[in-house]
Amino acid sequence: MANYFNTLNLREQLDQLGRCRFMDRSEFATEADYLKGKKVVIVGCGAQGLNQGLNMRDSGLDVAYALRQAAIDEQRQSYKNAKENGFEVGSYETLIPQADLVVNLTPDKQHTNVVETVMPLMKEGAALGYSHGFNVVEEGMQIRKDLTVVMVAPKCPGTEVREEYKRGFGVPTLIAVHPENDPKGEGWDIAKAWAAATGGHRAGCLESSFVAEVKSDLMGEQTILCGMLQAGSIVCYEKMVAEGIDPGYAGKLLQYGWETITEALKFGGITHMMDRLSNPAKIKAFELSEELKDLMRPLYNKHMDDIISGHFSSTMMADWANDDANLLGWRAETGETAFENYPSTDVEISEQEYFDNGILMVAMVRAGVELAFEAMTASGIIDESAYYESLHELPLIANTIARKRLYEMNVVISDTAEYGNYLFANVATPLLREKFMPSVGTDVIGKGLGETSNQVDNATLIAVNETIRNHPVEYIGEELRGYMTDMKRIAVGG
């Protein structure tokens, strides 16, 4: 199979990369009706599979789970997940031929095998659904021409898909139809009904493409969403402990600090996050973030280039063929880092203290979001896609670190995201350790500036504020957050 994106000419590539339109709520007036009375069969019952299925059932759809016979016979976790929640469970051979929509929610590395197995069993004119387009775009899966191929990609982990639905809300969702597979012209009707059944239409849906979803998703998760948080956690912890800060305090400041700092980002963008700092601290964070952007821009651009060219996906698929040797080795190394093993502490840290003593963390967030956004948009990805795959998802990933450190983040994200995270962090960590961290002190990470006066130069502060507020990510962010008026707040510090 050939990489689908690389078979397109330049005009087609740019057209697909630039697809992203915020859909009006009126476009979902019929909600999930198009799929009512039809059979939805989900393959895979992990976090996305189970939680999307629960939402779809609660929205009035007929949902069942098709699992491999071995998973049923051995009563594996996927079987238990489905059975304990009262779903019909059967083998591929039993359920797939009945399905009007087969939703493939297995891990990326299983997609080729799963699709090649279920496709001969699917009835004429049925639909095949994905929540990530890697198999179609990067592996170039050829799908039977009578089948409609759609994507509904919630922009958060599966557990959040369920929790937001139960609140009567949803999570922002990208939807797409594969242009090579829409024989009856019903792809958008199916995708919209599926998205509405998960609750996504209540938070906002973006009409996208398989290409735009894959390329932006890979870039976001490798850099700011996971790689930057991992590298930042490791080097900031090392710095604080080396400078005599209590390891328990240092670890807690980072573990819960990312979540607290990005919570401000969620509600008011980079502008509001920076406004949570005192004026002297804001100027310091701005200066640090400018240094970080200069240092790390080549690394961000390399990741974007490797994603666009297909080099990243071919490298990762080679590791799949080698039994995930690199992935598993890097996972073990992460578990051995000092931050992952810091001693627990009862020390209390107030919400504002996370900002005051985490100035460098704020700088890393600003630098990382802006660099990821800039690399994506410079490559033809439209602002809306770049926003969702950088700034918007960051608080959701930071929340996983607050639960169980980097381990939890890497468990919750996909293996594809985890592999890309390590690729980035393995370069970013020594880069920061050698080229940046020696020049910073505990005034920006661990202790705070301790200023007795809030006095700053007026012209400097005005210039800093102007630069922060006039970045393109702030303009599109303000527009898109306007559609998400019911975002929930976190409980600070776990």
Curated annotation (Swiss-Prot):
Q: Which PROSITE patterns match?
A: KARI_C, KARI_N
Q: Which GO terms describe its molecular function?
A: ketol-acid reductoisomerase activity; magnesium ion binding
Start and end of every KARI C-terminal knotted domain?
Answer: 209-344, 345-487
Entry keyword set = Amino-acid biosynthesis, Branched-chain amino acid biosynthesis, Magnesium, Metal-binding, NADP, Oxidoreductase, Repeat
> Per its UniProt record, what InterPro entries does this chain match?
6-PGluconate_DH-like_C_sf (IPR008927), 6PGD_dom2 (IPR013328), KARI (IPR013023), KARI_C (IPR000506), KARI_N (IPR013116), NAD(P)-bd_dom_sf (IPR036291)
**Catalytic reaction annotation:** (2R)-2,3-dihydroxy-3-methylbutanoate + NADP(+) = (2S)-2-acetolactate + NADPH + H(+); (2R,3R)-2,3-dihydroxy-3-methylpentanoate + NADP(+) = (S)-2-ethyl-2-hydroxy-3-oxobutanoate + NADPH + H(+)
Enzyme class, broadest EC rank = oxidoreductase
UniProt remark on cofactor binding: Binds 2 magnesium ions per subunit.
Give the enzyme's EC designation. 1.1.1.86
Pfam families per the UniProt record, alphabetical: KARI_C, KARI_N
Entry binding sites for Mg(2+) 1: D217, E221
* UniProt KW NADP keyword: yes
- Name-wise, this protein is Ketol-acid reductoisomerase (NADP(+))
Report the residue ranges that make up the KARI N-terminal Rossmann domain in this protein: 14-208
Listed under GO biological process in this entry are:
isoleucine biosynthetic process; L-valine biosynthetic process
- For substrate, which residues are the binding ones? S414
Q: Where does Mg(2+) 2 bind?
A: D217, E389, E393
Q: What does the UniProt record say this protein does?
A: Involved in the biosynthesis of branched-chain amino acids (BCAA). Catalyzes an alkyl-migration followed by a ketol-acid reduction of (S)-2-acetolactate (S2AL) to yield (R)-2,3-dihydroxy-isovalerate. In the isomerase reaction, S2AL is rearranged via a Mg-dependent methyl migration to produce 3-hydroxy-3-methyl-2-ketobutyrate (HMKB). In the reductase reaction, this 2-ketoacid undergoes a metal-dependent reduction by NADPH to yield (R)-2,3-dihydroxy-isovalerate.
What pathway does the annotation place this protein in? Amino-acid biosynthesis; L-isoleucine biosynthesis; L-isoleucine from 2-oxobutanoate: step 2/4; Amino-acid biosynthesis; L-valine biosynthesis; L-valine from pyruvate: step 2/4
Family per record: Belongs to the ketol-acid reductoisomerase family.
NCBIfam families, sorted: ilvC (TIGR00465), PRK05225.1 (NF003557)
Give the positions the UniProt entry annotates as the active site: H132
Q: What does this protein need as cofactor?
A: Mg(2+)
Q: Which residues form a coiled coil?
A: none
